[in-house]
Amino acid sequence: MRILKRFDKWMAMVAIVCVAMLTGCGKSANEGESTQGEPKADEAVATETTEAQPESESADEDVAVDEGLGAITGNWKSTLITVSPKGNKANIEDFAQAFCSKYDSYEPNKKMLKYLANPKAFDKEKEVYGVISDVSNGYISSCLWTEIDRFTKMCYWNRKNGHQLVGVFMINGSENEEAENAFLFYDFDPNTNTMTPDMDVCKVVEKVALDKDFADYALELPQKGKDIEVKLYSDNGEDGYDITEKLLKWNGDSFTLVAE
């Protein structure tokens, strides 16, 4: 774009000189532009096309990285998600399809959508992502196959009132920055096929996971069983962390912290 700006200034100077010369010769400025302006305009368009396109693609990639989980957590509390079950009853893949489609700027969600579109064609080696879909146990995950933690994990529980509680846990790891993590919970109403943020369950989990006495946390959503394992990390003053584990037991509607 710097080349285009210098080129525009040069064109402006040339235009001024041409106007002065053509005025003296009795020609209009429009006549002068018809012979010189058109080829130069083509050149300018060509330059802008070849240079601006890569910059645009790079900018898009930077935005996706910079947003991280903020693009999801920034407005999820007020966002309802519509689910389109493929069968008579919604399953974990239906929940994942709906959630990841709503928040498809996050890379693990993109990969999960790609897998769900055609599981047999999904190449985990090429994609550098692995997707586990365990429909019978109501669990699905999309994880980056590197030392960096970057994933989306989901599962659901059947509630006493006939609804489902859908849980989501995400970590967005980075080589250069501290990892982001977030958990979300939704109440799914099968009568309306709508996922509504469940802030009551979130508050229960927050009391344990966001304990200020610890530096960080991670949730282990159950692939088998019904309880959530919470890992709390504290800096041990050396080159690592001490881990404290707590258990949130499913009670049919929400979770109860198991006394130590």
Regions found by a protein language model. Give the residues of each.
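Terminal domain-start segments
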Residues: 33-157
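Bacterial N-terminal signal peptides that target proteins for export
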Residues: 2-14
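Long, low-complexity intrinsically disordered regions enriched in Ser/Thr, Asp/Glu, Pro/Gly
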Residues: 26-28
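Structural signature of eukaryotic scaffold interfaces centered on beta-propeller domains
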Residues: 153-161, 217-224
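C-terminal motif of bacterial Sec signal peptides marking the signal peptidase cleavage site
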Residues: 21-24
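Short aromatic loop motif centered on NTY/YTY
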Residues: 194-260
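Mid-length scaffold segments of soluble, non-membrane domains
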Residues: 162-198
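Short consensus segments that form the blades of beta-propeller domains
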Residues: 143-145, 171-179, 236-239
